[in-house]
Regions:
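Enrichment for repetitive, rod-forming helical segments
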Residues: 9, 15-16, 43-46
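Kelch-like beta-propeller repeat domains
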Residues: 29, 33-506
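Serine/threonine-biased, Pro/acidic-interspersed low-complexity stretches characteristic
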Residues: 5, 14, 29-32
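Bacterial N-terminal signal peptides
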Residues: 14-25
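N-terminal secretory signal peptides that target proteins for export/translocation
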Residues: 1-9
């Protein structure tokens, strides 16, 4: 992994450098596309039926078609929150146990497999917090749970923040926010500042005001009332996606989806989802950075009745509208949607009924270019509510967590998924690449496999919890082929790739 020096808007980037060769990529023909549907589709089976079918002797097992899983390994914590650091390690944490007032946390080394205890050294329940990776690679954690000793009384949020330094592998207390927040959303802006919104306050009421954190001054600033979240879309853990025009798009949970302009501190109603309110669904901004995709979820805020539907909106269109695309094979909510190294999407985990009821063990791979879903190899441990998933630097996927009270041992585990592309040929060899790049810079990557390279992309490492990855982002770069080298052009501005740290992956 490589670190990018940060501090100026002209410097990049908290991303993985991805180089894709012809031997790694395959695609289904257009004739293999599934028909689009406005409903979950009658053919969508229950998770229990699909899980049983996948476990049968006749189930597909070719890694080049359905991928493969490692056996579960006990991490020592239930990974409700996870962030991939530029050091190649994963920071994982959950809620304090018993009378303890410190949040348990672990570091997992994705190369060696070793773990290290990094329990937060100061009091604070950072369960259901927001978090994002700052421009210098540190992890900002915002809000959490105050708790409430009175049965039947809603839990309250806190103003506390914490910062984890991957270099020293230590925690420090951050500047408190202006408002208490439990279940907030964080998004890094092109300026390198963090926009924090929603979450339940100290009275268990959802905050409408937003605030912004400047890591240079360590100051939180409340935004004017014009920036308040639209009342009809107030919810926790909103899916916020940075657009290339510098605005931020809200992709749910509510049916009405809005765009926020940081320059004017105002919201604009953009479009309404066809499914309606899509609570506990997952959403990503697709590799072209103009389309936002969402799948799964439920119309019931309390959970249950999962949908298999998926929708996409093209925000570059003159009048953007949500459109249904092919539904998943299995309805699910509280699942994780991971952008893979080749630009396809992996939907992993989730449940169909209640938070932990009828867990889905079969991941599904979605190819946006062909609008097709493909069932992958079944994983061992169920990953419904409070589970996490991250793309790792070697192109595999980490799947962990879920505090299902009936399966606490499984909840402490993690599994690693190898997507089909890792079984389709040798990876390209990178001989050299720059350790730092600036916006719109042309840089050279030397590789003996230049002629077979089909794509070069930057992938921002994820920071995820509750079916919401605050950070993942896939940016396709312009590339020109030479003899034994590639001439690559960096993104034109921080609107495409916010500043920070990066690592290499191929």
């Amino acid at each position: 992994m490589r670190t990018i020096v940060s501090g100026k808007r002209s410097l990049l980037i908290p991303f993985l450098i991805i180089i894709i060769a012809l031997t790694v990529l395959t695609a289904l023909p257009l004739s293999a596309r599934q028909s689009k549907s406005a409903k979950p589709a009658a053919s969508a089976q229950t998770a229990s039926a699909r899980n049983a079918q996948a476990a049968s002797p006749g189930a597909k097992s070719d890694p080049s078609q359905v991928g493969s899983w490692t056996a579960p390994v006990n991490l020592g914590v239930i990974t409700i929150h996870a962030a991939l650091l530029h050091t190649g390690k994963i920071l994982a944490w959950w809620y304090p146990q018993g009378t303890n007032v410190n949040s348990p946390a672990k570091l997992y080394d994705t190369v060696t497999g070793k773990t290290k205890d990094v329990t937060v050294p100061f009091p604070g329940d950072f369960f259901c917090s927001g978090h994002t990776i700052l421009a210098d690679g540190r992890v900002l954690v915002t809000g959490g749970l105050l708790g409430n000793p009175h049965p039947g009384v809603p839990d309250d949020g806190i103003t506390a923040t914490a910062i984890f330094d991957p270099g020293s592998e230590t925690w420090s207390q951050g500047t408190p926010m202006n408002l208490a927040r439990w279940y907030p959303t964080d998004v890094e802006l092109p300026s390198g500042q963090t926009l924090t919104l929603t979450g339940k306050n100290e009275h268990a009421v959802i905050d409408l005001p937003m605030e912004q954190y400047d890591p240079a001054t360590e100051v939180w600033t409340l935004l004017p009332s014009s920036a308040n979240i639209p009342q009809q879309s107030s919810d926790t853990y909103l899916k916020m996606k940075l657009l290339t025009n510098g605005k931020v798009f809200m992709a749910g949970s509510n049916a009405d989806t809005y765009t926020f302009d940081p320059a004017t501190n105002r919201w604009t109603l953009t479009a309404t989802m066809n499914f309606g309110n899509r609570y506990h669904g997952a959403a990503v901004i697709l590799p072209g950075l103009t389309k936002v995709f969402t799948a799964g979820g439920t119309a019931n805020h309390a959970g249950g009745g999962a949908t298999a539907t998926a929708e996409v909106i093209d925000l570059a269109a003159p009048a953007p509208q949500w459109s249904f695309v092919s539904p998943m094979h299995i309805p699910r909510y509280n699942s994780n949607l991971v952008i893979l190294a080749d630009g396809t999407l992996l939907e992993v985990g989730g449940a169909q009924t209640e938070r932990y009821g009828t867990p889905v063990l079969i991941p599904e791979l979605y190819d946006p270019s062909t609008d097709t879903w493909t069932e992958m190899m079944t994983q061992t441990d169920s990953r419904p509510y409070h589970s996490t998933a991250l793309l790792l630097p070697d192109g595999t996927v980490w799947s962990a967590g879920s505090d299902d009270p009936t399966k606490k041992i499984a909840g402490h585990s993690y599994e690693i998924f190898s997507p089909p592309y890792l079984s389709k040929g040798a990876r390209p060899t990178i001989t050299s690449a720059p350790s730092a790049i600036t916006y719109n810079q042309k840089f050279t990557v030397t590789t003996p496999d230049a002629a077979s390279v089909t794509k070069v992309a930057l992938v921002r490492p994820g920071s995820t919890t509750h079916d919401n990855d605050f950070d993942q982002r896939y940016v396709v770069l312009d590339v020109r082929h030479g003899t034994g080298k590639l001439s690559v052009t960096a993104p034109p501005s921080a609107n495409y790739a916010p500043p920070g740290c990066t690592c290499s992956c191929w």
